[in-house]
From Swiss-Prot:
Keywords: Cell cycle, Cell division, Centromere, Chromosome, Isopeptide bond, Metal-binding, Mitosis, Nucleus, Phosphoprotein, Ubl conjugation, Zinc. It comes from Otolemur garnettii. PANTHER family: NEUROGENIC PROTEIN MASTERMIND, PROTEIN MIS18-ALPHA. GO terms for cellular component: CENP-A recruiting complex; chromatin; chromosome, centromeric region; cytosol; nucleoplasm. The modification Phosphoserine is found at residues 36, 39-40, 232. This is Protein Mis18-alpha. Belongs to the mis18 family.
Length: 232
């Protein structure tokens, strides 16, 4: 009886039963999470693109030539380093930046570091608008994370992508070179801190005790010598 009632609980209800409402809430939460993830990836791509678009291409109508050159100089001065999100090994940098692919959440680089290994097994691309492209999968040499793929063969209309490395935004992180303000202090220029001060004061106290002991020994010797001289 209970099973029959639960299977028909949604029928004839004007406000909707609890199981239906719960299912709708779960679907809504899942959709919101996916939209949030897609939005964050999109923002990351736009950030990388905006930081380095000034180094290539023409300036927009509202920008002056001076502003464009200044932005390009800043970009070249502080390039982005792309790291593996799994083990943080450097994979490449923005000096080899070509463009991004917003539809696939990928960035295209001309070259990558030795930390990127290439699987020589070739596969046909199943992506839209990439019919005829032959790809080779990219892996991190440190943690074997799947990073993306490299275009080995392309049809004539996609020749611009040939031999370019396509890194997935989900598999990489970025670091602005020179952004760290903290400097490493060498051993010969170590900062004077409370711990070193305590050690120095302890050493000085030990030296003071040694000097006092030597002073007492010297005083005893002088006393004996003066006593022996008075007897003679």
């Amino acid at each position: 009886m209970a099973g029959a009632w639960s299977s028909n609980c949604c029928r004839g209800s004007s406000t909707g039963c609890m199981c239906c409402n719960k299912g709708k809430r779960n679907d809504s939460l899942l959709l919101g999470k996916r939209l949030s993830e897609d939005s964050s990836r999109q923002q990351l791509l736009q950030k990388w693109e905006s930081m380095w678009s000034s180094t290539s291409g023409d300036a927009s109508e509202g920008d002056t030539e001076k502003e464009r050159l200044e932005e390009a100089a800043v970009a070249e001065e502080k390039p982005l380093v792309f790291l593996c999100s799994g083990c943080r090994r450097p994979l490449g940098d923005s000096l080899s930046w070509v463009t991004n692919q917003e539809d696939t959440n990928c960035i295209l680089l001309r070259s990558v570091s030795c930390n990127v290994s290439v699987d020589k097994e070739q596969k046909l691309s199943k992506r839209e608008k990439e019919n005829g492209c032959i790809l080779e999968t990219l892996y991190c040499a440190g943690c074997s994370l799947n990073l993306g793929y490299v275009y080995r063969c392309t049809p004539r209309d996609l020749d611009s992508k040939r031999d370019l490395f396509c890194l997935s935004v989900e598999a990489i992180e970025s670091y602005i070179l020179g952004s760290a303000e903290k400097q490493i202090v060498s051993e010969d220029k170590e900062l004077f801190n409370l711990e070193s001060r305590v050690e120095i004061e302890k050493s000085l106290k030990q030296m003071e005790d040694v000097l006092k002991a030597l002073h007492m020994k010297l005083w005893e010797v002088e006393s004996k010598l003066s006593f022996a001289g008075s007897k003679s």
